[in-house]
Amino acid sequence: MAVYAVTGGAGFLGRYIVKLLISADDVQEIRVIDIVEDPQPITSKVKVINYIQCDINDFDKVREALDGVNLIIHTAALVDVFGKYTDNEIMKVNYYGTQTILAACVDLGIKYLIYTSSMEAIGPNKHGDPFIGHEHTLYDISPGHVYAKSKRMAEQLVMKANNSVIMNGAKLYTCCLRPTGIYGEGDKLTKVFYEQCKQHGNIMYRTVDDDAVHSRVYVGNVAWMHVLAAKYIQYPGSEIKGNAYFCYDYSPSCSYDMFNLLLMKPLGIEQGSRIPRWMLKMYACKNDMKRILFRKPSLLNNYTLKISNTTFEVRTNNAELDFNYSPIFNVDVAFERTRKWLEESE
């Protein structure tokens, strides 16, 4: 029976991973490692769940928290393209924090690491080039924001660490998973968009081109892919060692606006008029200045305007081929759960 650790386990994705691990037959103990205290800690009658408050940049505390762990699912990150955090803060957590986790793996002889990367480790790039493809599609990877850069660098770090020698001469095996736009209950961004629509009289004003298609994925299926990858990476001859996979399910691929309308229309949200691009650009520039001068974050800035209007569509089944992944939540269930959460959080 194994001991798993989930960094960022009190977060949006991490909590769902912990919930699914409770049903994993080969897991005896789950260590939930997060810098914040979980206000609603998950409990179980069949698994030992230990919550450890810890900064992943503090090597000594990380080492202590991970001592005796067999496998790490590393989800801890600062996900920010809105200006809430400084560039240094994002790099410290996303890149250097991952360095700390890898160092602990080497020092403690932890053989398996599943890393939560991001689609932004690939794109959309700073040129606004569309991406339609899979894990092996050629694309100009040129990050346009420090968040994307930090996830790209951390993914490369984790991939390079695969097959490296750790304590007692054993080998470390790693795998990276790249979620596209995650949605589901607990998604703060979806909640913000919903609240904005309510404030505007149940109207969603459109800001994104209809042909800017983005792949989306439900949080429960992303969590399931992590749990499944954690199982398969331990098999001798596993195909996933040293590989990266996009996270996907059967959620609609469409523009951000159209996706939100599909999700929220049963909640009474109606389509509004399209805001002209010149006006969006003007507000984006204004918000960028506020961020620079006053550290004021904003959902609309030049970076978010560009990436939301740049197609990033994943077409792959590599996770199915290599570790037998298939979504465990269909779209109807995913939408129903998300809508219920939005209604209850009003």
From Swiss-Prot:
The active site is at Y147. It catalyses: a 3beta-hydroxy-Delta(5)-steroid + NAD(+) = a 3-oxo-Delta(5)-steroid + NADH + H(+); a 3-oxo-Delta(5)-steroid = a 3-oxo-Delta(4)-steroid. One of its GO terms (biological process) is steroid biosynthetic process. Pathway: Lipid metabolism; steroid biosynthesis. Keywords: Early protein, Host-virus interaction, Isomerase, Multifunctional enzyme, NAD, Oxidoreductase, Steroidogenesis, Viral immunoevasion. Transmembrane segments: none annotated. NAD(+) binds at K151. Pfam families: 3Beta_HSD. Its EC number is 1.1.1.145, 5.3.3.1. SUPFAM superfamilies: NAD(P)-binding Rossmann-fold domains. InterPro entries: 3Beta_OHSteriod_DH/Estase (IPR002225), Lipid_A_modif_metabolic_enz (IPR050177), NAD(P)-bd_dom_sf (IPR036291). Belongs to the 3-beta-HSD family. Catalyzes the oxidative conversion of Delta(5)-ene-3-beta-hydroxy steroid, and the oxidative conversion of ketosteroids. The 3-beta-HSD enzymatic system plays a crucial role in the biosynthesis of all classes of hormonal steroids. During viral infection, steroid production contributes to virulence by inhibiting the host inflammatory response. This is 3 beta-hydroxysteroid dehydrogenase/Delta 5-->4-isomerase. The lineage of its organism: Viruses, Varidnaviria, Bamfordvirae, Nucleocytoviricota, Pokkesviricetes. The gene is OPG174.
